[in-house]
Amino acid sequence: MKAVLTKEVGGPETLVVEQIDAPAPAKGEVLVDVAACAINFPDTLMIRDLYQFKPERPYSPGGEISGTIAAVGEGVDGWQVGDRVLAGIGSGGLREKVIVEAHRLFKVPQGIDLVEASALLMTYGTMIHALKDRGDIKPGETVLVLGAAGGVGLASIELAKAYGAKVVA
């Protein structure tokens, strides 16, 4: 299978595409045929060794993926071949097939585009945590969004409005 790999510290120009062996799921894991892999700011830092997590090279960047389950490992309940999923995996997403621990999977409903689904976890998850868990946002409050053009900024606008807040962006 094809994989985008980082073998040396540097920017996107240092990434290479190579053939690697396809993995097989172990106990508690599934194999996902990757439909899309979201690239986020931490991915750009990781390939430059500027992030707190530094996977051993060579590795594939890409921390969140969507796709279809291709194989299910022993002991995995609730998932089957053909299920549409998304997952936050930390790194390794820029491959044709990815091993994912079953507890990291989220089901993608029919009618939701897998490319769009791949970009939900980090951006929307970050803002749900910020607005609800940390900020305890209430209807009628005002949210100021500085930097509304990126994924997290756009998610903050949409979510703040959904929570009933007034948004200034």
Give names to the regions the model predicted.
Residues 21-38, 50-92:
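Glycine-rich beta-strand-centered segment in the early N-terminal region that forms part
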Residues 42-48:
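Cytochrome P450 core scaffold surrounding the K-helix E-X-X-R motif
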Residues 89-102:
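A structural motif shared across PLP-dependent enzymes of the aminotransferase-like
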Residues 104-121:
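Short peripheral tails and domain-boundary helices/loops at the edges of structured domains
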Residues 120, 124-169:
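Mid-domain Rossmann-like dinucleotide-binding core that forms the NAD(H)/NADP(H) cofactor-binding site
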